[in-house]
Amino acid sequence: MIGYVTLGVSDLAKAKAFYNELLAEMGGKTLLEMERITFFGQSMAKPMLAVCIPFNKEAPHPGNGNMVSFTQTSKEAAEALYHKAIALGATCDGAPGQRIEKMFYGAYVKDPDGNKLCFCHFG
């Protein structure tokens, strides 16, 4: 059910060093690195932890860099959950779409309390 959890950080290099060392104890390793985010885990098919500089580059705090992602079996399933969340009172924080070509499709909402959620499909 959980795809990945994102934690906002202020120093990505320091966070990568810390989590690489810590998560190695559980068989974790760096799986994907991009300019402002790094994903750790055992494989892309299992739950992951990501650390990132918040998208708006403001200071990280709960709700600004933190997000829970729910992996789905298809792009259509991710989009359906996005629309269900909107119908239940969530607000759009990123319309459904391919974010990384042939690798990641995501749809983002904020729940009624402002918590950021993602419904995604890897592929």
Region annotations inferred by a language model:
Residues 1, 61-65, 101:
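Short glycine-enriched loop/turn motifs at secondary-structure junctions
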Residues 1-16, 68, 123:
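N-terminal beta-strand motif that seeds the catalytic metal site of vicinal oxygen chelate
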Residues 7-49:
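Core segments of cupin and vicinal oxygen chelate
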Residues 20-22, 81-86:
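Short amphipathic alpha-helices in soluble, non-transmembrane regions
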Residues 38, 66, 103-107:
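Short beta-strand micro-motifs in enzyme catalytic cores
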Residues 41-82:
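Long, continuous compositionally biased terminal/linker segments
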Residues 83-123:
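Vicinal oxygen chelate
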